[in-house]
Swiss-Prot record:
Stated name of the protein: Anti-sigma-K factor RskA
KW Membrane (keyword) present: yes
Membrane topology: Single-pass membrane protein
Function of the molecule: An anti-sigma factor for extracytoplasmic function (ECF) sigma factor SigK. ECF sigma factors are held in an inactive form by an anti-sigma factor until released by regulated intramembrane proteolysis (RIP). RIP occurs when an extracytoplasmic signal triggers a concerted proteolytic cascade to transmit information and elicit cellular responses.
A matching Pfam family: RskA_C
Length: 232
């Protein structure tokens, strides 16, 4: 029997979180998580929670449900006889993207008129190289779903306290020849229990970092890095 690695187990967190596994596969994953070293099990559970929180926020803007045959077709691609680890993540995110962008509009006659351009969420979530990473940020979590192919990411912050008045959270793209690049700011009013933002032009950046900066932000980081999410 091929030995399972910790990396392979963590790769299964996304399809597990999105219910893109069978009952037998879910039971097997549960057994592996229970037997895994505590840091690995904690990392698995953190990613499952982050993916579910992220998709809940991204999909909250629509109440449309995708047609049943679409989800069936997507999940058929993850059957054991044809599945590969790299395809699990793509298929699972494709299923989630269908919910997030409201593909249930097919039932409303969208096929009779030109399709709207894909949203940023759709572009990222359906990318072949989509990845997700999550880290604590204060008492909450910050999650980035990103695609190098699309050069774009989606940031979701859950249960992060707003910055103090007169300051902002500032996001920084780290790495690359130009050093830290500002990826935007969030003031007190912009931070809610579930906050989303789009990250564009990821370029050669290797991480997304957060600092607290005075006023409306700084040209370069001046505060302590509160969280750093790898984008490798």
């Amino acid at each position: 029997m091929t030995e399972h690695t910790d990396f392979e187990l963590l790769e299964l967190a996304t399809p597990y979180a999105l219910n893109a596994v069978s009952d037998d596969e879910r039971a097997d994953i549960d057994r592996r998580v229970a037997a895994a070293p505590s840091p690995v099990a904690a990392a698995f559970n953190d990613e499952v929670r982050a993916v579910r929180e992220t998709m809940a926020v991204v999909s909250a803007a629509t109440t449309a449900e995708p047609p049943a045959h679409l989800r069936t077709a997507i999940l058929d691609a993850t059957k054991p006889e044809v599945r590969r680890q790299s395809r699990w993540r793509t298929a699972a995110f494709a299923s989630a993207a269908a919910i997030a962008v409201g593909l249930g509009a097919f039932g409303l006659g969208v096929l009779t008129r030109p399709s709207p351009p894909p949203t940023v969420a759709e572009q990222v979530l359906t990318a072949p190289d989509v990845r997700t990473v999550s880290r604590p940020l204060g008492a909450g979590t910050a999650t980035v779903v990103f695609s190098r192919d699309r050069n774009t990411g989606l940031l979701v912050m859950n249960n992060v306290a707003p910055p103090s008045r007169g300051t902002v959270y500032q996001m920084w793209l780290l790495g690359g020849a130009k050093g830290p690049r500002s990826a935007g700011t969030m003031g007190t009013a912009a931070v809610t229990p579930s906050t989303t933002a789009t990250l564009t032009d990821l370029g050669a950046s290797t991480a997304l970092a957060f600092t607290v900066e005075p006023g409306t932000g700084s040209p370069q980081p001046t505060g302590t890095i509160l969280a750093e999410l790898p984008l490798g």
